[in-house]
Regions:
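Sec/Tat signal peptide C-region and signal peptidase I cleavage site
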Residues: 17-22
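A cross-taxonomic marker for long C-terminal extensions/tails that follow the last structured domain
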Residues: 25-36, 107-181
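Histidine-anchored nucleotide/phosphate-binding helix
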Residues: 68-87
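Bacterial N-terminal signal peptides
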Residues: 7-16
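Acidic helix-start/capping segments at beta-turn-to-alpha-helix junctions
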Residues: 88-106
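Acidic/histidine-rich, surface-exposed loop or edge segments in extracytoplasmic proteins
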Residues: 47-65, 107-112
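Positively charged n-region of N-terminal signal peptides that target proteins for export
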Residues: 1-5
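Soluble non-cytosolic domains of exported or imported proteins
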Residues: 62-73, 117-121
């Protein structure tokens, strides 16, 4: 009798480990950002059988530079909505490309202060949380140049692409779904 109980406990432990990797329903992926309200009985829900490859186009600045960019919050909300139904995209399957007026949101504090007059970039903690969740946050090098931002001041959790235009075209041709600003 003791051996079957130990075997059952081992199986349950293994199942919970597998479930943690797959995503657990009700799970918040990005804590503190992208608040959601779970809804029962929705007609359409995230599909655990799909591979979510999504590209977020981030061009708009926040209403004021001391606020978190609402488009970055949208990325967190998307991940939390998926996580609420037990869906976790694979590493790099969610991509954020930042350009246009939003470009300064990817800079370290000193450069952000120079550009905006706000001492600390309120977006850096969210960008770090997104990266930890497997999101690839990128910035357009053409936008850096156009906004007179030194590429060396881009935050450590952000990659620099040749251009947002080519990134968006390439990823869509490879099957990423575009979510506009």
């Amino acid at each position: 009798m003791r051996m079957p109980i130990i075997a059952l406990a081992g199986c349950l432990s293994l199942m919970s480990s597998v479930n943690a990797l797959a995503g657990v329903p009700g799970q918040t992926v990005i804590a503190g950002y992208g608040a959601i309200t779970p809804i029962e009985g929705a007609a359409e829900r995230p599909d655990r059988k799909l591979r979510y490859r999504v590209l977020f186009n981030v061009t708009k600045a926040a209403a004021t530079p001391d606020k978190i960019n609402p488009s970055l919050e949208k990325v967190a909300r998307f991940l939390n909505l998926l996580g609420n139904d037990g869906v976790r995209p694979e590493q790099g399957d969610v991509v954020v490309i930042v350009h246009g007026p939003a470009t300064p949101i990817v800079t370290e504090d000193r450069a952000y202060a120079t550009k905006t007059g706000v001492a600390a970039n309120p977006n850096l903690a969210l960008i770090e949380a997104l990266k930890k969740a497997g999101v690839s946050v990128r910035v357009c090098s053409q936008a850096l140049i156009g906004n007179k931002i030194d590429p060396a001041t881009v935050g450590k959790n952000v990659e620099t692409d040749v251009s947002a235009l080519t990134t968006m075209a390439t990823l869509q041709l490879r099957g990423w779904a575009l979510i506009p600003d």
